[in-house]
Swiss-Prot record:
Annotated gene: dnaK
Single annotated GO MF: ATP-dependent protein folding chaperone
PANTHER family found in the cross-reference section: HEAT SHOCK PROTEIN 70KDA
Sequence positions bearing Phosphothreonine: 196
HAMAP family: DnaK
Pfam families noted in UniProt: HSP70 (PF00012)
Annotated keywords: ATP-binding, Chaperone, Nucleotide-binding, Phosphoprotein, Stress response
Reported induction: By stress conditions e.g. heat shock.
Function description: Acts as a chaperone.
Protein's UniProt name: Chaperone protein DnaK
Residues covered by region (Disordered): 484-528, 598-637
Low complexity composition-biased segments: 600-620
Protein family according to the UniProt entry: Belongs to the heat shock protein 70 family.
Species assigned in the record: Chloroherpeton thalassium (strain ATCC 35110 / GB-78)
Tree of life domain: Bacteria
Length: 637
């Protein structure tokens, strides 16, 4: 049996490691470097270059040199307008999926990533002297299902069986904590890489690595800092020469390399000079770009990016149910954490010096290799418990999202609940699967829909439909629905969630906070309407069953109160629905008192309670609880 290698498939650079005995080893590539640029180039002669070879020729072959492909993984064309502007190569849409066009051929991001993974695979094979077929590959913690699936697909294209997809901050924590199994620590892993930002809070102890919460921004990384410098340099040159260098692919590539170099130099120097001779030429002769940039200027230009760093940190600590003071260590991961301002912000927020004991460029690959060792059995006494970043559920009566799996739930996990029908003789139900944090279905992301047919006709609330959500260790969701009476089952693996962008995720969370009062009001309105609907249903049922036993006067009053409630229900105004419900319940109580000569609970009130138990989402977590989903009535006639 061969080794399971660990690969950090990064936006800017990639790295591969493997367990040798009890120790993880980072493997240098053929050029002698321990990290490999995540770049692929296609030359005029048809040759394909990967890594350093691609980077060396990028200036003279800018439109055919692909970098930052990770930003396009598992994303539709609609989700990457800003990313498309940042690259000199052509991004086109095929079925609304982002594709790279080179000449007359298009490549999927998975294909390009597979070329990088092949390079890492070959690097490992050269080192080990044997074939490698299995790997653990890391992804940003905030990657959605489609992005994770795209990463798995890239591995398969590269000839690798992807044994596990794990989150980058979690992998870093594994590497950091491997020799600290006996200590009990609460660790925040701050991961700012080339294209993404993640923050995870973990609890380490006795070999258990438990993720308490995770947050992040998949549109924030070193590329964004580079882009701001590129725009600054281009604008400065335009002021002097009235020429926009961004329209020249070769000049733009030179600007990109100069911006990245300046950013790196400003991490150790207070100022740097960008000097690009012969950047372009006009009728008057060659033009040169010379611009001085101070660290203060850089920090001022990038202020908006620095501001975006702290909010995910606040949410991650809050969702972990911890105080910032309870965090024992802050581990920095990713090359962009070398920026002094980033380190300053982290220190100020957490109130302690960040831990820089790990190599930010290699630690994620090391963690992936350790996880490979765990899966292989070479590493024992280590248990990794990761989480899902967003809540998952289905739409129920009144357009409410009923959550089955809460955000930051440890995965793998399975949760099931029992729901029922919303109408008499309903023979088909539609399961509307949602992801997000808002109470109303319309405010959340639709992951998919599917139907369960063949339900025997029965009164509403009688059929029992068991809905199960199952998230595997890779974070991929499976949903099934089963009719308990017939045993008929329908299931689906959710991959449509790939259409969920980071912008949408951030919007969901921010909206959930800023619209909290509005959401609460909407939820109360729906709950009131659902209760009224259940009361109407149960009252009509009771009238049909025992109406002839009621005194005529009381029956008339009940019918009048019922009609008023129906009218109020049609208006949707809770201010009129609640008094109408109270009036109907009062009439039932009076009728019941006369019937039984006692102050016993009214049949209508009892019926309402019973129907409410079936007809709307209750807060109980029991699996056998019957809830009323917003299912679609299918006419079989």
């Amino acid at each position: 049996m061969g080794k399971i290698i660990g690969i950090d498939l990064g936006t800017t650079n990639s790295c591969v490691a493997v367990m040798q005995g009890k120790d993880p080893v980072v493997i240098a590539n053929a050029e002698g470097y321990r990290t490999t640029p995540s770049m692929v180039a296609f030359t005029k002669s048809g040759e394909r270059l990967v890594g350093h070879a691609a980077k060396r020729q990028a200036i003279t072959n800018a439109t055919n040199t692909i970098f930052s492909i990770k930003r396009f993984m598992g994303r539709t064309q609609d989700e990457v307008p800003e990313e498309t502007k940042m690259v000199p190569y052509q991004i086109v849409s095929e079925g609304n999926q982002a594709r790279v066009k080179i000449g007359d051929k298009t490549h999927s991001p998975q294909e390009i990533s597979a070329m990088i993974l092949q390079k890492m695979k070959e690097t490992a094979e050269d080192f080990l002297g044997e074939k490698v077929t299995e790997a653990v590959i890391t992804v940003p913690a905030y990657f959605n299902d489609a992005q994770r699936q795209a990463t798995k697909d890239a591995g398969q294209i590269a000839g690798l069986e992807v044994k596990r997809i794990i989150n980058e901050p979690t992998a870093a924590a594994l590497a950091y904590g491997l020799d600290k199994k006996q200590s009990n620590e609460k660790v925040a892993v701050f991961d700012l890489g080339g294209g993404t930002f993640d923050i995870s809070v973990l609890e380490l102890g006795d070999g258990v690595f438990e993720v308490r919460s995770t947050d992040g921004d998949t549109h924030l990384g070193g590329d964004n800092f580079d882009q701001i410098l590129i725009d600054f340099l281009a604008d400065e040159f335009k002021k002097q020469e009235m020429i926009d260098l961004r329209k020249d692919p070769m000049a733009l590539q030179r600007l990109k390399e100069a911006a990245e170099k300046a950013k790196i130099e400003l991490s150790s120097s207070a100022a740097t000079e960008v000097n690009l001779p012969f950047i372009t030429a006009t009728q008057d002769g060659p033009k040169h770009l010379v611009v001085n940039i101070t660290r203060a200027k850089f920090e001022g230009l990038c202020a908006s990016l620095f501001d975006r760093i702290l909010e995910p940190c606040r949410r991650a600590v809050k969702n972990a149910k911890l105080d910032v003071k309870e965090i024992d260590e802050v581990v920095l991961v990713g090359g962009s954490t070398r920026i002094p301002k980033v380190q300053q912000l982290v220190k100020e927020f957490f109130g302690k010096e960040p831990n820089r004991s790990v190599n930010p460029d290699e630690v994620v690959a090391v963690g992936a290799a350790i996880q490979g060792g765990v899966l292989k059995g070479d590493v024992t006494d280590v248990l990794l418990l990761d989480v899902t970043p967003l809540s998952l559920g289905i739409e129920t009566l009144g357009g409410v999202m009923t959550k089955l799996i809460e955000a930051n739930t440890t995965i793998p996990t399975k949760k099931q609940e029992t729901f029922s029908t919303a109408a008499d003789n309903q023979t088909s139900v539609e399961i509307h699967i949602l992801q997000g944090e808002r109470p109303m279905s319309t405010d959340n992301k639709t992951l998919g829909r599917f139907h369960l047919d063949g339900i025997p006709p029965a009164p509403r609330g009688v059929p029992q439909i068991e809905v199960a959500f199952d998230i595997d260790a890779n974070g991929i969701l499976h949903v099934s629905a089963k009719d308990k009476a017939t045993g008929k089952e329908q299931s689906v693996r959710i991959e449509a969630s790939g259409k969920l962008s980071e912008t949408e995720i951030e919007k969901m969370k921010k909206d959930a906070s800023s619209h909290a009062d509005e959401d609460k009001k909407k939820k109360e309105e729906v709950d009131t309407k659902n209760t009224a609907d259940a009361l109407i249903f149960s009252t009509e049922k009771q009238i049909n069953e025992i109406g002839d036993k009621l005194p005529a006067e009381n029956l008339s009053k009940i019918q009048a109160a019922l009609d008023r409630l129906k009218e109020a229900h049609k208006t949707g105004n809770t201010a009129t629905i609640k008094p109408a419900m109270d009036a109907l319940t009062k009439e039932w109580n009076e009728a019941a008192s006369k019937m039984y000569g006692t102050e016993a609970g009214a049949p209508g009130a009892a019926g309402a309670a019973g129907a409410a138990g079936q007809g709307q989402s209750a807060s109980s977590g029991k699996d056998d609880e019957v809830k009323n989903a917003d299912f679609e009535v299918v006419d079989d006639k």
